[in-house]
From Swiss-Prot:
Polar residues bias: start-end ranges: 104-118, 592-614, 803-837
Subunit details: Component of the SRB8-11 complex, which itself associates with the Mediator complex.
Keywords: Activator, Nucleus, Repressor, Transcription, Transcription regulation
Function: Component of the SRB8-11 complex. The SRB8-11 complex is a regulatory module of the Mediator complex which is itself involved in regulation of basal and activated RNA polymerase II-dependent transcription. The SRB8-11 complex may be involved in the transcriptional repression of a subset of genes regulated by Mediator. It may inhibit the association of the Mediator complex with RNA polymerase II to form the holoenzyme complex.
Comp. bias intervals (Acidic residues): 447-465, 713-722
Lineage: Eukaryota, Fungi, Dikarya, Ascomycota, Saccharomycotina
Similarity remark: Belongs to the Mediator complex subunit 13 family.
Protein name per the record: Mediator of RNA polymerase II transcription subunit 13
Biased composition (Low complexity): 702-712
Any single GO BP term: positive regulation of transcription by RNA polymerase II
Magnesium keyword on record: no
Short name of one Pfam family: Med13_N
Region named Disordered: 94-118, 428-481, 583-614, 702-731, 803-843
Amino acid sequence: MSEATASNISTHYYKLGHLGTVSFYNYVSFTDNDQSLLELELSIRYAHPNILVTYYNKSLYYFTFGHNNVPLETVSRDIELPDLAKDINTDVDLSKDVTGPNPGANNSPSLLANPPKSASSGSTLGAAVDEYLPFASLSLLKSIKKMILFNLSKNGAIKLFGNYCVVARDTINRSILYLDPILFPNGDLLLSMVVKERINLLDSSIIDLKYPSQDAPDINFVIYLIPSGIRCHLFDPTNLVRNFVRKKSAESENLIDLIKLSTGVEYSFNSEEENVWIKLIPNLKHLNNQTSTIAKFIHSVDNKKFILWPWKLCLLQFGKFEEVDEITSPDVTSSQVHPTSNPLDLIGDLIDFNISSNQHHNFAQPSQTLPFSISSVASTGGDAGIGSVDPHTTMEQQPHTLDLNDITTHMVPDLFDLQNPVPSEFFTKEVQDMPPVDGTEVKEDTNQDDVEMDDLFGGSDDEGDDSRNGQNSSKEDLFSDAIKEEPKDALAAGTPAELEKNQLNDLFDISDKEAAPDSGKYSTPAKEPKFKYLDIPKDQMTIKKSSSPDYNDPGAPLPIMPTPIIPVANSVYSTNPPTAAAIGTEGVGLSDDQSSGPYNQPQPKQEIFNSGSSASQIQQKSIFSPILFNPIIKSNIDTKYGKGGKFYVDKEASIGPEEKKKKTFRETSVSGYELPLTKEEDKLPITAQAVGLRKMNNSSLSLAESSMSASSEESDEDEEMPDVISNSPPLRLNTFNDSFGGVPMGNSGGITLNNNPINLSNYNTGGFGSPNSSVIGRFPNIKGESPFSTADLQQTVSPIDYEQSNNQHTPSFPTSQGLQITQSVNNGSGRTSSSDESPVKGISESSNYLPLILRSINVSTIPDIYLLNNLISDQLLPSFTINDDDNDNDLEVMRNNEMFIKAKHLDEFLELIGPNLVFDLGFNQGRSKLSYYMDELVKSKLEENKVFPNSYKVNLIEFLNDQKDYESKDELEDQLDFLDDIANDDDNILNPKSQYKKLKSIEWDALTENTKNKENFEKYKLIVNKLNSSVSTKDEVYFKLPIIKARVLKHNNILNLNNLAINFWKYMNFSPIKSTKHFQVLLISENNGNGTSFLREFLDLLIYNYKECNLGHISKVNLSTVETRPDLENINDGILLVNKDNDQTYNDTYSQINKKLNSLVELIKLDLINKTNNFEFDRPLLLLFVNYNDNLNSTLQISKVFRNLKVSLTNHQLPLVSIFTKIIPGSLIVKQDPFQNWLKVLSNFKLSKLSMNLYNQCPNGSTNKDIVKNTFTQLVKEPPSRIQFKFMSNNFKHSNFNDDIFLHLAYERSIDRNWFSAAWSDPLGVVTFTKSWYCSNKATRNGSGGYGRDTHDVATVCEEIWNKSNELFKKLNDEMNNESSTMGGKKFLVLTRINSIIPDDELIHWKRLSVKHKDISLIVLSVSHSPKLIFQDNRPRFEDTENCGQLDNFFKVFSGSNNSSPTTGGALVTSPNVLSFHSPQQFLNAPGNFLSPQDFVSTAGGAGAGATSAPHGGSNNPDLILHDFGTDVIGIIPKVPLPSFNSPTRLGMKIGYLLKEWMNGSRSTSRPRRSYLVYEVSLLSCSNYWDLDVLMKLILNHYKNLIVLNDILGLRKIDGNISKNESEDDFEQSLEFEASGIVPWHISAVGKSLVYLSHIYVDE
């Protein structure tokens, strides 16, 4: 233990001074102008950097230390104040406040360190203490912190950030540096300094403004401001560069001055590179110290007020994007798509063949839009989104190939009925050079009908021809006014020459020319779009019960002329789709007066559109017209008639009367319109055009060359659309059809961007939820983040358009920046848009920058990591299939890494996914890399920059000695004073109390540099070093935690063994302490064509090992179907396989498994009905899933399948079937080769660990509904050290509490307040339980929704936590009664809040519950998720090698014996590889000393981790025992009241530390000294009869037990501390394994759950 002495361990605290007295002054404003006081504080600190002044509680506090004697005149009236506070001198009274304490009053530090809550009757300060002293105590620490941060910032050591600062790790990466001053009652002033490296912030210089895309791969980031730390969003989230401006105005000068005053740094904005400003919108939620939903962290806000901020004063936090395998990724942006990548390909191939073959005869004219596809809509090229490209914008773009990362940046704006032209550069030469089409030939082709699709679904070409024959009359009746105003010669503007000449024409001109460049002086109307079978929206496949559907007469003939109606032109929020006239103007229902501007179209073009838009007219026809027959299809009503058009009446709530008449699009990638193709076009490469404010990358435009291609379902059905569709949302999803109508577009100001070499819209900087984003039907509820509610939808145009409509043009970049912005006055029709005539109000630049600088945001609201998995991908996978069942299907995701779930049956889902996240045996550690993080101690900036030279690092021993012992007097104290006179001053160590007196009399501080402070500091440090070397620590404050023993059963006898013996379970022939558990197993996996025989081998090995470990018996599931159900498949040998091809997505695999498990339920029910007794209802069923999918969301998807099975069992009334699940990675058991998979060699150790883990997770019985599951072992309770007499009141000081019940409960709420997770455990592992909840921000809904019980509020969660605790207390009490005749004692609930103190909204419920249940006594703790690497040895490593042989070898890795002689029996098995027994005979023939330390020479963990070597080399010493040094933990209870990491400004009742040497530090060459992992335990509240030292020691001993339970319950990796190689990944895994070895299991369980669950988006 001498190597880990407290005097040699330095902490993360710096001592900045020792104070005797502190004086403070309080100043108030005459005019109650609080802002003037704030500005005065900035000015004073800038003029006097070392002054202690702060604004708090509407007052200005000024502090001085008594030994400095700083006069009040330091705060001079002659301070030059900036222009923003010219009259500050007249507003602020610089004299003392007469109601406060007297200026210069000598207040002791103890009074400020522990201010009284109320003034006593004898107080000299009287009522003034009540009013000012508590604020003065907080203000002193606040002023010291501000002063330190200001000086460090001024010297360039740090940058202010939020309530702390950031420090540079290198040129780009920044970490948060936590600086917290502490004032002890004895006058010591300390500073805590810890760097949190888990949050990685990047400097804005990572983005090169000249060539952004070349230096920044995939820009998905969050912007934070320096110095406030406020999160901001881009003003225009569609385009990063368009937010940059170069502005030098009075407002920006004021901002620069404020930043200089607050940070002490004068930033230069002289050069062009430095003078870059960015338009940002502050996140109001973050301003209130609240975090946005982590699962949707990239989003936009409804606030339209922007600021201009220097780009150099921004920090970026990038999201983590999980790479998706190209084969399984639904990425259709590339030119090659796998033929069966879509679930509907088999059906799509047949339909596409019919469509494409018939379309050659049905083509009426060249399409008037550029071919359209899903990829063109969902891909983000050039400028995507609202206002990113105005009607007069052209951009030259270089080819840009999308990689997998680009998927996360694509946003779909076409859900909001907003239109935008596409530049002519995207027209390929093949399309422009198309040969002209003869009009007569086209006329003949239009007479052909697609009979197969039209007979059933209506919308035939007869109606289209009839409408075209009468187009003139129809046009005059409906849209006569609009036609008369337009010039008639605009029809001739369609030649290729005109196309090359007029690149800035509107969207419809471009579309016409591009599709028919040689159409001459006329154009033929577009073919009418028709619905097909696959395009029936999902919401139209059911008839709402309360809706009265119109009479459907499939035999009624179609009218020659649909009855005309008058469109409501001015209704932006019309419930009906836009009419043809509206589409012809701006795509919305605007009147003619509103149709001017960028989307003003020539009337002849409108005529073309109107005549061919009978699809819109059909839906707008009179109610007297016959209605087309669209069958209502429901598949699962009757198997025989399910696909033939069976009608179904939905039982859900009804919809509006107009809703079913609207044009809707289901949430799928299949379009609903036939695509007219000519033979010529069919032979050309099809080029996709962005419809709906979209530019495309050239590389993403090339699709299949033939409609017969395997990807024709995506291309043929979507690529060419009639123009009526190009003016409406092409894939508007059914959830949004009811809420959103058309939105007007204002003039974008005519900005033209030229020579832009990058795809700027690929930068997604917070645009999720914006009009340009892919907010689709499954994410409709983003209120608070998304500005697009129905109330203010008319304001959802681009903020750039708002600004430009107010003539606030963005200054242009010079050509050297790679961008050229010029002004264009061409507006199409020559008229000014309505947005220019009436500027929109409400969008303005904020001029009050003071809150953005002084409002220090709590950095704890910044998530450590956020994922981009839930950003919508390019391709919309279908959520509808032909066999779609009635249940909500959330298995199908947008892409393979999306993490999304519906709220229905969420509790069942959490019940199943919880154990797989927590008790995972470390399987998820390598894949997610989200489990453990540590706080590193960075090299001190105080030492580097010498900002405060008179300071030093505090050793641990200074906190372990009680200063009251030095201050107390005894009888001999006066008699020993002569020793002080005899001894010299330099060697006066005979009397420590006299040294402490001298130490206490020396006053100094590092904040003020002068000669006196320097001399006193050197004297103080010299005395401290002597005291540290001479004073010893007591066992009560610095002690080694005991070795934990476990209980096992051997030959029906209970044994208490070292917990290390659990690793030899099978060899020792142990049995579980409880009864055996029997269950049946069904192994689920995929068959990828490389063999499946290894699965049967693995299952046989597992069953055999489980039996050999005496844990019970596992049986295989065998179920067979009956002749009447040939659709069900038999299950044999407990294996269920699903075929998976290499080009098949895992989404398809999970869907197939889901169907097979539903069939399993039917097989079980048939077995019960037929009484074949193949299924054992008395045994639980294990679903063992072998997972080959490495994506992070695979656990989520598999758990959805398990949830569906459990729901299906409930629906089929099979409550006797009890299931539990286990997900293991395929890499654990399979060695994958290109052509053949092989079973890995699995050691008995791994198989035994897996068997014991399955025993723990198996329910106690099929009929036993106890929430507590028995574990295979329990820990041994320490025997009492003395007899406890309960009639004696000893104040709990010497009690062992053997009869009392302690239940540890750890819980945490995610920082976005959406998830709760809790874990329960007693110190012995008798009861263990975990549970998670989803805490909805909305009101809990019950009734028709059916999922109100799955979403909870805080009160409900706290109630359930308390109820579960009561159940577990009852279980513990029953266990105690069974083992002894005594009744249980008091019940103590150790309530542990992780990563925070208990906030008020939770605290109120805990108080209410504790008052209600007075039989339970609360002990409240606060801990962190992970340990911190903050303690370090002062001595270099291996400094004491000479004394190494005489030391206790504490904290040392076993080096092993060098005895290689083969003459002894022990030498025969000295190699760990030899120690493997394959039969009981080998075990019995082993030498007697085979478990001696020499048998485990090179083992670092696992079975023989760190065995103690024999001190004298004896190999047959019977006293040798196995001991794992990795389990050695030191308990520390400081005598000094230290604050908690989670609450640095609030002292707890007591604090304790768990200390463990970081073994992996020996492998790090960058650390020349030993480092120690520190885990902090802070006591916040307990009953007043507790002795705090006794209670803290008891808790630390409990935590040692709970740490041991990590391996017993299976939270850590099986062989995590056995290093296989020296790779970086292996080192990280060893590091995480070691870090988790000092964290109690229930705290690790909560962390592992929340880390995963917080990234799941719940669709409510």
